[in-house]
Design a protein with these regions (language model features):
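Periplasmic plug
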Residues: 48, 68-114, 130
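A beta-strand signature from Gram-negative outer-membrane beta-barrel systems
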Residues: 96-145, 156-158
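Transmembrane beta-barrel wall of Gram-negative outer-membrane proteins
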Residues: 150-181, 185-224, 262-273
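Acidic/polar loop-and-plug regions of large Gram-negative outer-membrane beta-barrel proteins
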Residues: 209-267, 292-358, 423-436, 590
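Surface-exposed extracellular loop regions of Gram-negative outer-membrane beta-barrel proteins
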Residues: 227, 425-435, 478-489, 508, ...
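Outer-membrane beta-barrel signature, preferentially recognizing the C-terminal barrel domain
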Residues: 239-263, 267, 446-448, 496-511, ...
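Gram-negative outer-membrane beta-barrel transporters
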Residues: 379, 465, 572, 577-583, ...
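C-terminal beta-signal and adjacent terminal beta-strands/loops
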Residues: 628, 696-714, 744-812
Length: 812
């Protein structure tokens, strides 16, 4: 196996000596999109399986409709596949999107929660899943699956084959999947998936093995956009979507996302001794991900829910009534009129397009190398150490996907406020007034590069009464921007390579467990971690320039939890108290500011948040066929200081406002602070399983805008009612959701062979409760007249009662 070792060492060396240019994509206005298609609707709970923490499974598969994330901290999960963390510090590369619908290719080796010790790696997040694609872990045979759903997909097909040879022969695991949702059959519009995966593994002499995995998923799907409550009322639809419209008599969905990134990984493992193992992993992902949407410049806003077009904008009650009646009788007016848009483009004297369908492209090269060494000293002491090198390079540009009956589109920056300078609008001053044709690139053209080297070591001791572990990690992150266009706004700072930005990070954690008896024990986990910023935080707006974001400090997190556990034969009880603090949080937003009559950058820095609460759960087995799971959780997630902020004009980065934000004691999370969950799983017969889960969620804050809560604005308000209407944060009403699933297996006889068939049915929101999945304040605010209702809240609602049906045939 000398050639395998040589290959790994060569690629490790290559990754290390490469020049390290860091990247990160532009931070644009957040697009609030709830993507129902990402949920696993055909999941059926595993009956009578004791999890370390039932909160994770209940919240993940049943509580997402409330944005229920245990302990309140979003985006705090990670997934390690074959020893590789594919997550990137750069925007534009969504690793999980690259295997959408392909979860069957993975086998879970381990999962740790609350930063507990793992022999598979070092976790810095609330929950880390360690997955493998090794063909050795799948049973030999064929699996054929078909499914139907009115939420995630209309139809799905999967074929899975695993071939297991002799010990020293190659083993194969292969997987094919397709999903299809025709236009208009889901709130997001459409969905198309074609994916394939192949995994090869071979055992060699001297306890060595090598494996190769390739997955390739081509997915495109629509995205649902939020809207104000008024349009939901006018449309009489709980899943109203303003981002689609009619084109030549057909439904047209321009708001979408796609992925086309093949991912290759190679793994090598060797047992050096009976007590030590080394694992080496290499990975490479090369391809393209992106989004598309309707764009426009120098013309009227085409969005049907634009505030000036709605009845509420009129001050005349008679006019409002007439508009309400008109929308009631003309529901097509609540969708985009693409036929009208085409006429406007055609009517242009020069045949210039004012409206286009734009595609935001991220051209991705992502390389990974990692090593893990595990050592068992004796029956009491063990340790593991590892390193991962991550190198990402992403090229960002726009492509005109559809000119909508026009002949060209000017390569202008439509977000610029006219300052009288002739070159301000130019995206590329070397090609001024460039006419872009369909399929050609336009707009920002830049590259971001990043490199991270992460290392860690962990030690664990087990004794009859005590267990403890401790771990230390250190990482270095590097970022750089490279601009390929010289735009008219930032002539001296848009073209060429930026300064190389370097950020170290370090952290430690510890775990102590005391066993009162074989059934009862107490555990405490504590940690302190310094995180490096990602590229979106480092650069203010890399699409235009390489200026660094203000308030750039390392993110600091520390915390502790204390838990009590009882593990009986028929009952399992958990009670946990936790406290976590986060410092130097930052936020950045691009929006239009009425007071300055300009697009601006809003930057928040040195924000501090506290997450604290109690978690409890009970599992018990009744009558030998019924498992009952209950959970009650209460938390308090709040901002603990008044952070700093700045407002910078987009045209020239001139600071027009700065100071403090009055955010102290306001909510730090949008998930519910109070949750109660009950799950009943029954097995009336050996082949039949039934599950019913109900979740009650309360004290759930909306997502709110920080910048209108500045001391600069609020301290001038003498009227308490006006002050409260702007400063205070609204909470959503407490609600309840009921979900259910049913599975049945039967055996067909074919000669002497039995062929098992598995059927499963899952139902979400059985009571069809109208649940707002997402509610947020718009970034646009009336800073002049301080009218909080001028730009009302935007909503996305749950789809209501949804189902998924799956049938699987297995031949061994």
């Amino acid at each position: 196996m000398w050639f395998v070792r040589k290959l790994f060492l060569s690629l490790f060396f290559f990754l290390i000596i490469q020049s390290v240019y860091a990247q990160n994509e532009e931070e644009v206005t957040s697009q609030w999109v709830y993507d129902e298609n990402e949920r696993t609707y055909n999941w059926v709970p595993t009956l009578l399986k004791s999890n370390k923490n039932i909160l994770s499974s209940i919240s993940q598969f049943n509580g997402y409709v409330f944005n229920w994330i245990p302990r309140g901290q979003s985006y705090n999960n990670s997934t390690i596949i074959d020893g590789i963390n594919w997550a990137s510090n750069l925007n534009g590369w969504n690793a999980s999107f690259s295997y959408t619908g392909m979860y069957k290719i993975f086998h879970q080796k381990e999962s740790d929660e609350n930063l507990e010790y793992s022999s598979e790696g070092y976790s810095k997040n609330y929950r880390t899943s360690y997955l493998t694609t090794s063909a050795n872990l799948f049973r030999k045979g064929w699996q054929f699956h078909t499914g139907f759903s009115n939420a995630s997909y209309m139809n799905e097909g999967r074929i899975q084959y695993s071939g297991a040879g002799n010990r020293n022969e190659w083993r194969l695991h292969s997987f094919l999947v397709f999903q299809n949702t025709p236009n208009g059959m889901s709130p997001s519009g459409f969905k198309k998936i074609k994916g394939a995966a192949f995994s090869f593994d071979k055992l060699f002499y001297n306890n060595q093995s090598i494996g190769i995995t390739l997955w390739w998923n081509q997915t495109s799907q629509g995205k649902q956009a939020p809207s104000v409550l008024e349009t939901y009322t006018l449309s009489h639809q709980r899943n109203y979507n303003p981002s689609w419209g009619w084109l030549d008599g057909q439904a047209y969905y321009p708001n979408s996302k796609y992925t086309n990134v093949p991912v290759l990984s190679i793994r090598y493992e060797k047992n050096w001794t009976e007590r030590s193992t080394v694992q080496l992993n290499l990975g490479l992902a090369v391809g393209e991900q992106g989004t598309s949407q309707l764009d426009w410049t120098s013309t009227t806003d085409p969005r049907p829910d634009y505030y000036r077009y709605l009845p509420s904008y009129s001050k005349d009650s008679s006019m409002r009534s007439q508009l309400n009646n008109w929308f009631e009788s003309n529901p097509q007016a609540l969708q985009i009129n693409f036929d009208r848009i085409q006429k406007i483009n055609k009517a242009s004297v020069s045949k210039r397009s004012f409206y286009i369908i734009n595609k935001n492209v991220a051209d991705i090269i992502s390389a990974r190398a990692s090593a893990l060494y595990k050592f068992q000293l004796n029956n009491y002491w063990s340790a593991n150490a590892g390193v991962q090198i991550a190198r990402d390079k992403i090229h960002y540009f726009n492509v005109i996907d559809n000119l909508l009956s026009g002949e060209f589109f000017y390569n202008y920056n439509g977000w610029v406020i006219d300052d009288g300078l002739i070159n301000s609008f130019q995206n590329n001053i070397k090609s001024p007034d460039q006419k872009i044709k369909e399929g050609e690139r336009w707009g920002p053209n830049f590259e971001l590069q990043s490199m991270q080297v992460l290392s860690w070591v962990q030690i664990k001791n087990i004794s009859p009464r005590w267990e403890f572990s401790t771990g230390l990690n250190y990482a270095t992150d590097l970022f750089q921007r490279n601009g390929y266009n010289q735009n008219g706004l930032f002539i001296n700072n848009s073209l060429g390579r930026s300064t190389l930005f370097y950020f170290p990070s370090i952290g430690y954690k510890g775990e102590v467990l005391y066993k009162y008896s074989g059934r009862m024990y107490a555990r405490s986990i504590f940690f302190n971690q310094q995180f490096a910023p990602n590229a979106a935080t480092v650069f203010l707006d890399p699409s235009l320039h390489s200026f660094q974001t203000p308030f750039l400090l390392p993110n600091l997190k520390n915390g502790i939890d204390i838990s009590l556990y009882y593990r009986g034969v028929n009952a399992k009880i958990m009670l946990s108290a936790y406290f976590q603090k986060e410092k130097n949080e930052s936020q950045k937003r691009f929006f239009y500011h009425d007071r300055y009559n300009s697009f601006v950058y809003g930057i928040v820095g040195q924000k501090e948040s506290i997450y604290q609460g109690l978690e409890s759960s009970v599992e018990t087995l009744l009558f030998n066929f019924l498992q009952l799971e209950m959970s009650f959780n209460i938390g308090h997630y709040f901002i603990s200081n008044n952070p700093l902020y700045e407002i910078l004009l987009a045209n020239d980065i001139y600071k027009v406002e700065s100071g403090l934000l009055r955010l102290k004691n306001l909510p730090a999370a949008t998930g519910p602070e109070i949750t109660e969950a009950v799950s009943i799983q029954m097995q009336p017969t050996y082949t039949t399983r039934i599950s019913v889960t109900g979740i009650y969620a309360a004290k759930r804050a909306i997502s709110y805008d920080y910048y209108r809560r500045s001391a600069f604005l609020l301290d001038k308000i003498s009227d308490q009612t006006t002050y409260s209407s702007i400063h205070n944060v609204s909470y959503l009403p407490a609600q309840f959701v009921l979900n259910a699933s049913f599975s049945k297996s039967i055996n067909l006889k074919y000669g002497k062979q039995k062929i098992p068939i598995y059927c499963n049915f899952s139902f979400k929101n059985l009571l069809s409760t109208l649940i707002p999945v997402l509610v947020f304040e718009q970034s646009r605010f009336d800073y002049i007249n301080l009218n909080p209702t001028k730009f009302p809240l935007k909503y996305l609602f749950d789809q209501g009662l949804t189902y998924a049906v799956g049938i699987q045939l297995q031949i061994q």
